[in-house]
Amino acid sequence: MAECKRITVEPLTREAFAPFGQLIAFSEHPEDERFEVLIREEVHPWRIAMFRVRIRQAQRLECHPESMESFEPVRGMGVLLCAAPDCPEEIHAFPLDTPVCLNKGVWHEVIALSGEALYKITENCEVSSEFYPFSQPVGVEICISGKEEKA
């Protein structure tokens, strides 16, 4: 197996993820405990898709300059790699066990920790994509109780 760049997975919190998007979860004090609009964009029609992930290392990042994109876990476990629009080399990694919505233009890729991970995606009907290839593959390191596990 070729050597790859290792990224440490960070806890997925509102604050840590804020530069890239937002968690799809109730706010701390919603006005209505049953229903809360979290993300709204009235400009473009949207679509729902299923996304199957089997890769264990990322070869590239992609971004969608004109579309936000949600990732909602259905089955399996994966890690979301993210980078700000102007810094694709400064990669952050988050466990993708909570629904999230990426801001427009955020560089991203999902890698699987389980054999396969399945996600529901919501995005604009028409999505333009840009790609940023890595010079070497990118994987993740997970620290559990002070012990490193490589994926």
What are these regions (language model features)?
Residues 1-95, 110-151:
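Active-site region of the double-stranded beta-helix
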Residues 97-105, 117:
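Extracellular beta-helix/beta-solenoid repeat scaffolds
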